[in-house]
Every structure is written in C-alpha cells, then in structure tokens.
Amino acid sequence: MNKYWKSLTELKNGENSVPDQAMPKGNLEQILDIFDKNENASKSNRRDFLKLCGFSLAISTVVASCENSVQKAIPYLIKPEEVTPGKANYYASSFAKGNDYCSILIKTREGRPIKIEGNDLSGVTHGGTSSRVQASVLDLYDTSRYKHPKKGNQKLAWEELDETVKKELNRLKNANEQVVLLTSSIYSPSTISVIQKFIAQYPNVKWVQYDSQSASALIQANEMCFGKAGVSDYRFDYADMIVSFDSDFLGTWLMPVEHIRQYTKKRKLCNGNTSMSHHIQIESRLSLTGSNADKRIPVKPSEQNLLIAQLYNEIIKLAGKEIYSVLENNTDIQQIAKDLWSHKGKSLVVSGSKDTNVQVIVNAINFELENYGSTLRVDKQLHTFKANDSDMDQVLKDMKSGKLKGIISYGVNPVFDYQQGKEFSDALKKIDFSLAMDEVPNETTALMSLLAPDNHFLESWNDFEPKTNRYSLMQPGIRPLFDTRQFQSSLLSWMGEDSNYLNFIKNNWEKNMYPMQAAYPNFTTFWNHTLQQGIFEPSVKSVFDTKFSLTNMNSFVNQLAKQVDNKDIELQLYESIAIGDGKMANNPWLQEMPDPVTKICWDNYLCVSPKQAEEMMLETGDVVELNSQVKLPVYVLPGQAYNTVAVATGYGRQVCGIVGKNVGVNVNFLLQSDDDFIGDVKLAKTGEIYDLAMTQTHHSMEGRAIVREAGLEEYKKNPSAGNESHHAYENASIYEKPKFPNHHWGLVVDLNSCVGCGACSIACQSENNVPVVGKKEVIRAHEMSWIRIDRYFSGDEFNPDVSFQPVMCQHCDNAPCENVCPVAATNHSSEGLNQMAYNRCIGTRYCGNNCPYKVRRFNWFDYTKADSIPNNLHDVAEMTIDLKRMVLNPDVTIRAKGVIEKCSLCVQRIQEGKLNAKIEGRKVKDGEIKTACQQACPSGAIIFGDLNDKESKLVKETSSKRNYHLLEEIHTLPSVSYLTKIRNKKA
C-alpha cells in the first residue's frame, strides 16, 4: 500500500509531528499567551473562561440562559408581482471579468443576488463554475466600490462629468491628438459595435486591448501557421493522449471550467467503461494540472523549449520526413513521440509558453499528428483572449514620447500588473486627459484625473461571444446600488446618442443574430426566449480549410534548440487560481481559499524544491531576498523542479479595499521580457521567519487508509483493485444497519473526476453563510470551511503522485458525535442527516473531539454579526457591515460565537425540493435536488441523491466495486462515500 503524506514534515517525522490543535498544549500561561500573540491584550470574556475550564456542563448551562435582543423582520406592504417572499428568483446571465467567462444563473431573494449557479444549457461551460465565479457575488457588496463620478477627489454629478469629457474629447479631436482607449479583451458583439461607433465619431481614438495574462503567442502562431489569428478551440474530451508543456489547463490556462469538464469526461469509469485518457505533464512547478497527470516530468523552464524541439523532430521522423536539426536524444521524449503517433487524430499537445516560436512548433506537432479537425479546431475559436502584447508596448512608447495626449481605461490595471508598470505609472502622470471607467479602485484609476464608475456585472446588461457562434446574454439581478453607469452607456452618452444600452443590444441582435435562426417568427419571441435561457447557439456550418502554411520550420526549430547554459536558479511566475491577476484580491472568500496544491491562503510565497531547500538550509516559513529586490517566505514544495523557484502574481495590491491591501508581494515587475522565466536568480536567506496560513496539516485523520487508488491495468483485471478491504469492513458488524423509511440522503464523490479546483468549497461558503476568519485565525486552525479538499502526496518527494479528496461531514448513521453531546444539539434526522440545533449548542466541542473525520467547526468569535454583543465580533473582511450582509442566504441560520457548525448536505435545498414535489403531488425525482457543492462542480465529481431510491444514479454508483467509505473499520456507517482513484500510468 502507498504511504500518503500531507507535508514534508509529516513524511520525514511521522504523523504526530504535525500540529493539529486549535489551541496549544501547555500550562495556563502558554494557553493565555495565544490571545496576546499579534494582537493587543483584551479583557477575558465569558467564552474565554469556558474555553479554559473545559466547558463544564454546569457553567455552560448558566451562560446559555443569557438573552439576546429581538430583531424584527419588516414584510412587504405591497408585494411586487414577480417576488414571493421566501421563494428564490433566477435570472440567466453571464459572468465576464477580464478573460474569465461563465454562463450563469443569478439566484436572488427578495431582490438581492445571493448566489451564482452554472447554466446547464450552455454549450461552453455546461453548468460548471469556478471558485472565482462563485465568489463574484460578494464583490457586488464590496464597500470599496466607487459610488459616484469624480474629478480628482471631488465628487461630480454625471451631467458635469459628461460635459467635461465631451469637451476634452472634442478638443483632442480638433487638434488631431492621439487618445487611447485601453481595455481588456472584449468579446461582446454589442460592446465592440459601441466602441467602433465611438472611434468613428472620434477618429483620433485608438482602441488597444491588453491582457495581463496574455495569449498573444498563441494568437500570432495561429496567424502564421493558418492565416487566422486567434486562439484555437481545444477539445480535451476527444483526446486519448494529452501532453502538456507547462500549461495549467485545469487551473488558469484559457478556459479551465470548460477544460475540466472535457478532461474528466475521458477519466470517468462508469457504465462498464474501462478506458481513460493518458496525460503527461512536463513542467517546473507542481501545478493543479500536473497534480492530476498520470505521469509528470519536472524540468527547468529553460529546458522545455529544447524538449519541444526534440519532440517535433521525433514526430516528423516517425512521419518519414527529414529532421531540421540534429538534437540529443531524450528517452522520455522518444517514448512520448511513439505514444502520440499511435494516437494520431486522438491526441493533443499544448503549451503554456508565451514564446511565439514555441507555439508554432506545437502547432506543427499537432498538425503532423492529424489533430486539427478533431481535438483542435481553428475555425472555432476562443474569443476571451484577443490582446497583442506588442500593442501595449507601443502604447507605453507613445506615452513616454509625448505622442499620446489622452487615455481612457476600462477593466485594466497596467500600473500594477504590466511588466513595465513603474514606467507606465510615471508616463501616465504626464498625460492631461486621463479617464478611468472601473467599478473598484486600483493602482491605475488612482492616477487618473477623471472617474466614470462602472456597474458591477450583476447590475448590468451585455452580451458575449466567448467562442465562435456561441452567444450569451448578461442581465442584471438588481438595480445599481450606487450612482454608477455602464461603460457602454457612458460611451453612447459621449457620442450624443441614446445611452440606453439595453436598446442598443436589442437592435444589434435584431440586425445580426436574429437572422441566424429560423425557429421564431418574430424578434420579440426570439429575444424573450434567448433572455430566459441565457444563451443562443446557432448551427453554422464551418467553411474554413485548415492548411499549415509554413513550409520551412528550420528557423523555429533552431531557435528552440538553443541549449540555455544556465546552471543557476530560474524563477517562474504563475497565476493564482484564487485571485487571478489581482482583480479579485479584495474578495475575502478567495483570499481564504487555500491554494489547491500548497494549501496556503492569504499570501504568495516562493516555492522551492526539497533538494534546493536542503542545500540552502531552508525550511517552510524562512524569508529569502530575491535578487535583492523583494522578500518572500519560502514554501518547500514536493515536485518542484530542482534549481527552480516559483511565485504567484496578483498579490501585493496597494490600492484596493481593506481585504486585499498589502496581502503578499507584487512580483509582476520582475519579468522584464517576453520570456516565461527569469534566469540567474540569486536567493539570500535573511534569517527572518514568516507565519504562513497553511491548512494542509489541520484536521489530520492520523495517516489511516483515506485515499484508495489503483492502476488502470489492475482495475481492468479486478474492478475492486485498491478497494479489497471494503467488503470485509462492510459486513463486519453483528448489528443491523439503521433503517430510514422515507428518504435516506447520501452523496458520492468520484476521486477520478475531482481535480481539486476548489469551486465546491466557495459554493458551500456562499450557500451556507460560512464565515471568513482571517489569516491569524487560519494559522490557529480556526478556519470555518464546511468542505475541505485534502491533498495527499505519495511516493518520491522529488516527484510525488498527488491525490485530492473533498471531505465534508460524512452524515454517519452511527455517528460518534451524537452520543457525546450533553444537550443533544447534534442528532440524527429521520432521513439519515446528522443535523445541528444551533440554539441548543452550548459549545463544549465534545462532538468535534469525537469526530474521526475532523469536519466540525467551532465559532470562536461572532464573524457575521449573529448576536448583539460587541465583544463577540471578529470582523476581518467587513462581513459584519450591513452592505456585505446582503449576501447572506436567508434560508440558512447564521451562527453565533460558541456554536459548532458543519455540513448539512444543504438541508434547506432538500426541504425546498420536498415541498415542491408535495405541492405538485409527486415523489421527489432523482437529480432534482442538488447540493451547492454538486451544482458548482465543473467535473460532475459529486453525486447526491436518495439511498432508498434503488433506481437513482447515487445507488448505482454506491454499488460500484470502487465505492468505499472513509475509516470503514470504525463502523460509523457514513452516508458519504468515495470511488477509488484510478491512474493510467501507461498509454
């Protein structure tokens, strides 16, 4: 059996070496000292006293008699026709922030958007979401949002701003002075039309698109190879073999929500299927995608180009063609080439490189493998990335030369995330006319002379074409909370046109989209149907012929074949899965979401290989100085390539709300070229120690057989491979299993489908009002997440296998937590749910101590203003402010200080589903009720249902030979089970 470990400390020193106490062991002075660490001393309160007294039953009973103030709800006097109190309304819409896109449903309660769900009708995202999509609803209630137009620090009325802007635009137009409209990639047909009209009226305005995480190399390579600029449509669900060079396509590359669904579709083993795709990842840093690979080859960034050139040589050699350069043979690459060749037309090679030469060679490899038209489509393109890096470089040159006299920015922050951000900042200060059109403050808007604040996307109308002929609409779920106006409406207003952008969209659709269909006799019917569904995906036949236009590949191969003689450390920058390029740095849900691989939150850090750390005598938490420019804490990451280090971008924001300000370090400026890495990096140990908020060692289950796995070949021979002990444990008891006459709710997690992305965790937080506790409390193991995604390493610490496992309350039918609660606050329902009576809980924490799965969470403070006692409040992210409390789900009780909470299997959704079925006089249908984690999951890894329904999908999965329960040997009889992880080690 494999040995599984969560950290290098655990691997080397054993289970008990890893701290897991929410409070430290020791004498009274040591215990009290934790309250003073990093905080001002404060008076003890009643809960502190109970903590130190072991929460005796007698004292707790006395304290529980305290009363809270009464708060009254105010009903509607005249109910709006479309609103029924207590019933949610859903609006089909779209999430679009920079390069992130998702077709969504907005859930509103009494006019408040409170939750984002995926749109199952979308042919792009297919109902899946990401952690950023789920967390975006909280940004609507961000207290740092701009609330009105401004000139400098002076508040303006919109009429005053419009007059000022028109005057400046006309002045610059008459003088024929250049103005730049700087935006992120725009893939809204109507917005593009508005911008084109704006430029037609002001011909001195030049439109430039800028992406901080750009796909410029892909776009240029496709134009060079096929004569069509753009990003190809990748189909991982058609690929039997995938080779990825540093492309984190499950984490941050292009469109992860779509990629995850496609990728896991080829990894599911159900309905008798025994075939899986084979995935090889060649990379420097252990990424989310690399963590899911069947085989991973750690290499330095400088070595990857040579390996790609070698792979191309091997492929054309197999094709019987003449090779361009004589390169050193690599055994791994030769075998990969043979495996790819045996999967011609059903393979896919991708690269995350920003080097155009690399992308040209990758295109050539895929063309030789006959993948175009199958796993790759040039005629169907991804439109969320359009920017050309050279355009932004030209803008900076024009600013510095004085040629550029005006700038209008929308949705970008180059002062922070552009490589030459400091130069951009200095040049921007010299421009007379500068106008920002953003919803929140950032480093760039702070330097602009004028501000026209934009709406949040949940307050906006828009349309999108994320992929060729895949259209979607955005509609608001609430009226603007502040005195803001959409970017498009502002442009229309400055043109002297009707500023109603909705009318503009409808006119554009009637002219361009309506003729693409024949199902609806008039535009009104077509529009209403499309608005209701949120998408329009016409069938349009492609006429593009994919021909590879480059005939001489010699220069490209030679460019890649140059061996970089770099023996020093190389630095690689990567995009954070949680906060991306920094646009969502002020979102506390995302800041507190642990990185899927390192399990660290509230910081960025320097990933160092175990061998490098040993040589330099570094440990996790040591602070190093990088090239005498920035200081960063070290994290020793298993699987990190030797002589390489990596750090996430998006951190170190200086101008934003209180949540994201000064969290981590900005490293964007370190990369001063188009290369993907920085060579010859010097690290100097400072002697300082930094506390990282790391959750990977919290809530340990003491090294027992938690993850079960097997190889594909073993599984084909024996479907119970890796799960042989299940049958013995399943029938070990002499007692009869509990019976539930009506429903018995349960859940299955397919470990083959779970990639560890974290969407489920944020969805649960949004649905169930799970509080944010802040970095200091996370360090104390006080985090509150109801569902954690455990990450396990196994094998060699220098290149380990990785397993992800979502763990929530297991809803045991023989629950150890229930019989130790002195007041029966936790008990079992008649439908198999382990439920909590919050107002009965007195906070002894006996249940948490007795839970073998460590899934119960204790409220050390009042994080969401659940009671009226000021001393109980602990507000790290303004979550107690009334504006942010608008995001709370009224169907879920907010918990007060001193109360235990945990996963309820979304009992509020179960009750709603049962009531709907009762009203309609029928039984609950299988799949009708979905938990928040299940609905958010882009891979469909979670299945919820009724264990009493023998025809349900859940029961079919629990009947699988791969099905097992956590810690079956202690006979807790969980209602949550798992399907063993199967790895395809050979193609």
Feature annotation, model-predicted:
Residues 1-328, 334, 601-607, 611-835, ...:
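N-terminal export/assembly segments and adjacent metallocofactor-ligating motifs
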Residues 234-241, 273, 277, 281, ...:
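Domain-level signature for respiratory redox metalloenzymes
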